[in-house]
Amino acid sequence: MVRSFVENEVDPQALQYNREEKFNAGVFNRLGELGLLGVTVNPEYGGSGMDATAACIVHEELSAADPALCLVSCLAHSMLFVNNLDQNGSHEQRLKFLPPACEGTAIAGMCMSEPGAGTDVLGMTTKAVASSDGSSFKIDGAKMWITNGTVDGVTTGDVFLVYARTGPGRQDISMFLVEKARTSSKHSRRGTEGFKLGQKIEGKCGMRASMTAELVFDGVGRENLVGEENGALLCMMRNLEIERVTLAAMGLGIASRRCIEAMNAYGKERKAFGNPINTFGQMQKHIADSYAEYMAGKYYVYGVAADLDLSSAGNGLDADGTKLYCTTMAKNVADRAMQVLGGYGYCDEYQVERLWRDAKLLEIGGGTLEAHHKNMVRDLAKNVVTLP
């Protein structure tokens, strides 16, 4: 079902929306109709009730055609907000916010990075201070590089999970629901005072059909605190694993049907010196290495996903490992595809040019390569085990 949807509805629009740098609300709504925006969420709250493997399949298939759409809808919206709230929110919070997010009538995201804090997430300076009577918090600060922070360059997305410092300790972080005022046929809400768009981020190298922004905050109600005060670090760790494995699956999508299939088809058809170029050793190396690396990554990602428990944090080592391997693999495969296609690969009509640009973000967002190296060596040193 997902592959058919991608071929018929996602693929035809990808080039246009990349060129125009616009968010495709119509395809986003279709994802909601198909149950793909709440793929891991309990059906009680409007989701499809599936597992991490299903989430990886959706990310891989969508990224084969349009990684930017996947980033907007399945990664930022479905994993960073929807899955996060489903695992960490109260029944009342889930009942209020998840149905519109799952059906695609609200667009959501998560706010962690700041202008001065990215990989060092505990270095965030955005603060949430409780009022004297304890009924509300005042959030003061700004978040940067927020996917879905805007969908039109003028207004914000609908609702976000925002991490903010609530105590003096380095780990005293809490998570809050922050929303803009909105009215629809099914859902109306007042919104959070002091929540506004800072700036839309322009001129990105890739993922141009995903909208990225700075968001500014000032004031939020206590009922929008998610989980325990000063307890968001556990929420963060719990959701990082599925985020990283699905980002790795996006790398598989970039490498697979578009880049490897493009190399394979072009190598058979294009002739040089009287022979198909896939008869030359240099081209054979590009194609064969890419296929072998893709298959290795595929088994790694789906093996880890099969054992992933969405309700707990337990396999950070391999969540980091899949993303470390597959994101760099995707960039390298896209680079080889561009090399095999030559001048055609350098033009956006052949799509490998766009995938080449999109792939780079995967090595940065959701944890840099350097952060994965640090995390993995730390975990391996703590738990010296016999490798499988």
Task: Give the ranges of each region predicted by the language model.
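Cytochrome P450 core scaffold surrounding the K-helix E-X-X-R motif
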Residues: G47-M50, T119, H187-R189, V226-N230
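FAD-binding core of FAD-dependent oxidoreductases
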Residues: P67-N83, C102-A117, A142-F160
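A short core secondary-structure module
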Residues: S135-S136, D140-F195
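A structural signal for short hydrophobic beta-strand segments in well-ordered beta-sheet cores
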Residues: T126-A130
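Alpha-helical interface subdomain recognition
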Residues: M1-A65, L75, N88-Q93, P100-T105, ...
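Long, acidic (Asp/Glu-rich), low-complexity accessory segments flanking structured domains
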Residues: L215-C235
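Flexible, small-/acidic-enriched active-site or ligand-binding loops
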Residues: S184-V220
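Short Gly/Pro-enriched turn/cap motifs at secondary-structure boundaries
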Residues: G116-T119, T150-G153, R165-G167, G203-M211
